[in-house]
Amino acid sequence: MTLDYPVPFHTPNLVWDYTIAIYLFLLGISSGAVQLAIAYKRSNKLENLSQNWIIRSGVILGSVPTLIGLTLLIFHLTRPWTFWKLMFNYQFNSVMSMGVMLFQIYMLFLVIWGVVIFKKEIEALINRFIPKLQFVMKLIGIAERIVSPVEVILFILAAVLGAYTGFLLSALISYPMLNNPVLPALFLASGTSSGIAATFLIILIAGKLKGDSHESHFIHKFEVPIMVTELGLIVCFFVGLHFGGGQKTVALHNALSGFWGVVFWVGVLIIGILIPLIANMFVNDRLKYNRNFIILVSIFDLIGVFCLRFFILYAGQLTVA
């Protein structure tokens, strides 16, 4: 049955609300930023890792959004004070529980990677404030010897985390639009895009790097391919719904009409994909590597990914099987 009334944020079939949408958005940023930072580190011979802003961004964006996302997830529980049960009592038939385990392993490897990168800074702090913790430096020394395989595993975990955000929604089998095999790949691509955009904002605003810096040139290599991939996956997503027939076709109609249709066409497609894509493909290099221009395009990219998360979550729950 098609909908003939506006239900932007309220529907009888709503199970997950805006908290989950923000949670998915934050995890995507974490996934993309960490993958980018590791790719940059392994592609360049860097003498002082802790002073490089792409590496710094990877550590910051890898950890902070994930911790904020987990906090949101905890307060989304019916009984938040029982969160420790979710953290340490795994249910292998629960996608959410498996996700929590993934986050814990991901954060463990991220911490190992981060302390190796900031080894000198940690040592200086220990010597100055807590000399009794000198044994920590021995542990970091051990971690330093295995940092290469740790990086490889962390990169894989970051990619799995990005795809997991799609698996989480596709597990809702009673919703035809969400029960879609394209979602994990789409969320991985869009999450990587948001991680790139967030990294750009940090290196240009906090790091005060120039728009034509080596770091900016490196990041630009990935922008267009990822956005084209994201656009292609969105097309595949909707084509699958269209030819799926039955409630899948109804779900497509409901999603692309009304309030959430506007969110998709304007927020996701125009602001989030077409404008950044055109800006990267057709403007001259002087504008393309302009600091303010990159910041503006990155903000558009983040808005688009944010809208995509809300669109998929809310529009996907408009129609049941």
Curated annotation (Swiss-Prot):
Keywords: Cell inner membrane, Cell membrane, Membrane, Transmembrane, Transmembrane helix. Signal peptide: none annotated. The keyword Metal-binding does not apply. It is a multi-pass membrane protein. The keyword Transmembrane applies. The chain crosses the membrane at residues 20-40, 58-78, 98-118, 153-173, 185-205, 224-244, 259-279, 293-313. Belongs to the NrfD family. PANTHER family: PROTEIN NRFD (PTHR34856:SF2). This is Protein NrfD homolog. It comes from Haemophilus influenzae (strain ATCC 51907 / DSM 11121 / KW20 / Rd).
